């Protein structure tokens, strides 16, 4: 979410705007690719149809990535993560949900810390090359 300059209301941030606020996403050792839903959806409007779309996206790209991060609003994040944990059983890769209490453009936003750590968790492997957290999780406010 970002604040609309004209109205002052919070609106979903398109990926280009999001990238502009977080250039460090693409400056690290971890390759980050972004897939966005169109139109962007407020988390209060998310339900079974969207859960299915997220699950299908993970399944369709499962062999291409070491892990997945789902940016999600806080209203229904726990419901979505729970639903996906049942839809994506027996994972060998992480699917990490995260979001923020404050929009990415706000000075003290927790968005950067939450997202960067979620990406690190999604990419983390043990000494044998296996995912450290091979399940659906939520990373939020310094807690996994």
Segments predicted by a language model, with ranges:
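Active-site histidine-anchored catalytic micro-motif
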Residues: 1-144
């Amino acid at each position: 979410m970002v604040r609309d300059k004209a109205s002052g209301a919070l609106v979903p941030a398109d990926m280009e705007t999001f990238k502009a606020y977080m250039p460090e996403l693409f400056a690290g050792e971890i390759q980050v690719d972004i897939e966005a839903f169109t139109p962007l959806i407020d988390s209060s409007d998310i339900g079974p149809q969207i859960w299915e779309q997220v699950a299908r996206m993970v399944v369709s790209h499962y062999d291409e990535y070491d892990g997945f991060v789902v940016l999600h609003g806080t209203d229904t994040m726990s419901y979505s993560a729970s639903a996906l944990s049942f839809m994506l059983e027996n994972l060998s890769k992480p699917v990490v949900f995260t979001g923020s209490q404050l929009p990415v453009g706000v000075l003290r936003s927790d968005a950067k810390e939450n997202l960067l750590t979620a990406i690190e968790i999604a990419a983390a492997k043990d000494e044998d090359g296996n995912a450290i957290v091979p399940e659906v999780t939520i990373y939020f406010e310094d807690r996994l």
